[in-house]
């Protein structure tokens, strides 16, 4: 579990306290959690990870054979009543249809926001609270808009990026940077989406409409999320990000 709140920044370095390692952040696994997953692998047939956090974390461990995690579910902070629904999801009584509302990167330090946070204690202010501050400098490139724009412009393959030593080493290419993109989500069934009609107008004051047919191609009932993105053209030298989310709709149970 991880907690976070307005005005409460997350530590960039936990400075090793017996369960953590120097250089690790609050949004990485600590030693207790790693040992627990190793125990689960050695003593149980299946390991399912529940992410009880409101923030995106580093979850590259899902790809590791060391822990053999078979499934992972981000549950946010559901509360006591919400956990009843979580039980139904992991047992298959209910089919999940949620989608991520943020980009989950393998390494937090590949996100520019990582470098805009620090503490505000002066060198001679030993009695002052060591509160952290965040300097907002990203402009419009927040969340998925940064990652998708950087990919569209080739930044993740450029020497400026690949030559930089990030917290967890070096990375190159979108697939090595982004583990789960904005809007990602799985289901116990599969779906097919097909655009059957579109009414697209280039006039800025007109509405555009796209009709999508959703077909459940699996054997379990479920809901699908239709997501519409666009890459708008540059106009009047206005700053522009690569991909814009323009709409989403969830289907009925099919």
Segments predicted by a language model, with ranges:
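C-terminal non-catalytic regions of proteins with extracellular/luminal or membrane-system context
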Residues: 1-254
């Amino acid at each position: 579990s991880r907690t976070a709140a307005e005005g409460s920044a997350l530590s960039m370095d936990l400075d090793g306290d017996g369960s953590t390692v120097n250089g690790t952040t609050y949004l990485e696994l600590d030693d207790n959690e790693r040992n627990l997953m190793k125990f689960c692998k050695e003593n149980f047939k299946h390991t399912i990870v529940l992410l009880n956090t409101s923030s995106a974390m580093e979850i590259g461990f899902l790809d590791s054979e060391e822990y053999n995690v078979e499934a992972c579910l981000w549950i946010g902070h559901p509360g006591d009543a919400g956990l009843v629904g979580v039980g139904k999801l992991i047992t298959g009584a209910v089919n999940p249809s949620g989608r991520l509302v943020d980009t989950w990167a393998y390494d937090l330090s590949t996100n520019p926001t990582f470098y805009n946070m620090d503490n505000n204690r002066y060198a001679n202010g030993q009695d002052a609270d060591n509160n952290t501050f965040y300097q907002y400098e990203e402009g419009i490139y927040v969340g998925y808009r940064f990652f998708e724009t950087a990919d569209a412009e080739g930044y993740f393959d450029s020497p400026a990026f690949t030559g930089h030593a990030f917290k967890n080493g070096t990375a190159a290419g979108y697939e090595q940077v982004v583990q789960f993109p904005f809007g990602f989500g799985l289901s116990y069934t599969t779906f097919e989406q097909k655009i059957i009609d579109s009414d697209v107008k280039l006039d800025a004051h007109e509405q555009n409409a796209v009709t999508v047919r959703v077909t459940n191609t699996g054997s379990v009932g479920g809901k699908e999320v239709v997501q519409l993105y666009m890459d708008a053209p540059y106009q009047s030298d206005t700053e522009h990000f690569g991909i814009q989310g323009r709409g989403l709709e969830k289907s009925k149970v099919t």
